[in-house]
Amino acid sequence: MRKKERYEKILAWFRENRPVAETELHYETPFQLLIAVILSAQCTDKRVNMIVPPLYRDFPTPEVLAASTPEVIYEYIRSVSYPNNKAKHLVGMAQMLVKDFNSEVPDTLEELVKLPGVGRKTANVIQSVVFNKAAMAVDTHVFRVSHRLGLVSDACTTRVSYTHLRAHE
């Protein structure tokens, strides 16, 4: 089977069996999902789901989180990986949402990746789950499976894999 045929079969399966992007992360608002996805980097969704309820309760809006400090946020997220950096990113992200985006989570890749702590993968999760846009969060797992299916080559990085996979949508 040729590569293009493999792409088409796989995409057809996902369209039929997984028509709506979902996540295991617990959230009720786009802002909460953004927090959870930032925290999920190098951490399990299970761990993130354990720690976010008090964070969501005490920092329900970008304005409230933006008024906090990384030191305060650290105490809420100390059990995730890289809590110092993530605390700084969360406060910075909230401040930028308030200052530049009227406290709303933006819906474009270009705007999302401007936020502290938000890379392409996080931006793509937000786009697909919150805004139902055709976006693919390529991480090492997607990259590995794509390689095993023969959809990308050994030499590809996750970013190149993303480009290759998007080309066949």
Regions found by a protein language model. Name each.
Residues 2-166:
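Catalytic cores of DNA base-excision repair glycosylases
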